[in-house]
UniProtKB/Swiss-Prot annotation:
The modification N6-(pyridoxal phosphate)lysine is found at residue 86. GO terms for molecular function: tryptophan synthase activity. Pfam families: PALP. Tetramer of two alpha and two beta chains. This is Tryptophan synthase beta chain.
């Protein structure tokens, strides 16, 4: 049985304590066997169709495009059960865990979407569920915390470091190193030690496969570009995987530029990172001059990650994919724009991809087809956005008042 390549070019690998090597090797073997097992594939496909609601729609937007030459399609992962693309690969990994005889699932979550997806899969498949979540994220994503608990998950707030996603990842990995005989670590993104980046890509691959057949049916040709937001990179690699060999299709990932790419407040390791070892892999990483991990920042909890999946690093290095960025303000604008123009409220993560797509659409000089992976819905973000908009309103009023005072003096 052939083993999988742990590297994508120079990126990837298995940089973990020796104690975890048997667990990762066992996982790799189980995954290879499952990929070749017709009954496993059948059960996975059946769950995706009849439980999760696949295939998801490919929606041509009516009013979003600012340019009559550009059509913008949305791949509607927001319509999936659980509210985001996360459900796809979580069902795959949970089935894999059962196949390996594991009784317990350990997971980490940022925005809470991966935690919710893990909780629903565990409830469905009768597995015990433990979710590590940065204390800061527990606070800003309370609806998802309640959803997880409602479905029987134990949510553990992590207070170390910046109390966000990277710290939750570290705690989850630490827990797993002491319990892998009975527990499976259900990693939520296409990053981490081998074989996780490959497993997650293969369990998200249907996003791009469906998109390809749907767009060919609708337009009779492939799109000019597929666009997806990138934190760790699972929704993007799921969209890109089936298009990598289609050279005429541009692959565009959009990282969070936060308060601005030139400030310390962003989460764009592909643009501004240096290669380092983090979370069991070799990948671009936000580091300071002493090599310490810098805190990443994004208005969207799910993109708040200081590194990126190794295959994205390789696609960037070879030039097959390009990686742009969108600021908090651009994402907030796109969030509102989609709601107003199409009646669809996107996740703040997905809004980063939308922001760049609208920018790209404006520049088109010939007929252009863009597909945006709408990776999740925005219910979880409405209170965050409401608070920010209220704050902006107050600041604007104060600035106007100040201006009036200055004119009167």
């Amino acid at each position: 049985m052939s083993k999988l390549n742990p590297y994508f070019g120079e990126y990837g690998g298995m940089y973990v304590p020796q104690i975890l090597m048997p667990a990762l090797k066992q996982l790799e073997t189980a995954f290879i066997e499952a990929q070749e097992d017709e009954s496993f594939q059948q059960e996975f496909t059946e769950l995706l169709k009849n439980y999760a609601g696949r295939p998801t729609a490919l929606t041509l937007t009516r009013n979003l495009s600012p340019n009559p030459l550009t059509k913008i399609y949305l791949k509607r992962e927001d319509l999936l059960h659980g509210g985001a693309h996360k459900t796809n690969q979580v069902l795959g990994q949970a089935l894999l865990a059962k196949r390996m005889g594991k009784k317990e699932i350990i997971a980490e979550t940022g925005a809470g979407q991966h935690g919710v997806a893990t909780a629903l899969a565990c409830a469905l498949l009768g597995l015990k569920c433990k979710v590590y979540m940065g204390a800061k994220d527990v606070e800003r994503q309370s609806p998802n915390v309640f959803r997880m608990k409602l479905m029987g998950a134990e949510v553990i707030p992590v207070t170390s470091g910046s109390a966000t996603l990277k710290d939750a990842c570290n705690e989850a990995m630490r827990d797993w190193s002491g319990s892998y005989d009975k527990a499976h670590y259900l990693l939520g993104t296409a990053a981490g030690p081998h074989p996780f980046p490959t497993i997650v890509r293969e369990f998200q691959r249907m996003i791009g496969e469906e998109t390809k057949s749907q767009i060919l049916e609708r337009e009779g040709r492939l799109p000019d570009a597929v666009i997806a937001c990138v934190g760790g990179g699972s929704n993007a690699i799921g969209m890109f995987a089936d298009f990598i060999d289609e050279e005429e299709v541009a692959l565009i990932g959009v990282e969070p530029a936060g308060k601005g790419i030139d400030t310390p407040m962003h989460g764009a390791p592909l643009k501004h990172g240096k290669t380092g070892i983090f979370f069991g892999m070799k990948a671009p990483l936000m580091q300071d001059s002493e090599g310490q991990i810098e805190e990443s920042y994004s208005v969207s909890a799910g993109l708040d990650f200081p590194s990126v999946g190794p295959q994205h690093a390789h696609l960037a290095a070879t030039g097959r994919a390009t990686y742009e960025s969108a600021t908090d303000d651009e994402a907030l604008e796109a969030f509102q724009l989609l709601a107003r123009s199409e009646g669809i409220i996107p996740a703040l993560e997905s809004a980063h991809a939308l922001a760049y797509a609208v920018k790209l659409a404006k520049e088109a000089t010939k007929e252009t087809i863009l597909v945006v992976n709408l990776s999740g819905r925005g219910d979880k973000d409405i209170f965050t956005v409401a608070d920010i908009l209220e704050q902006q309103k107050v600041e604007q009023q104060e600035a106007e008042q100040q201006q009036t005072n200055n004119q009167n003096n």
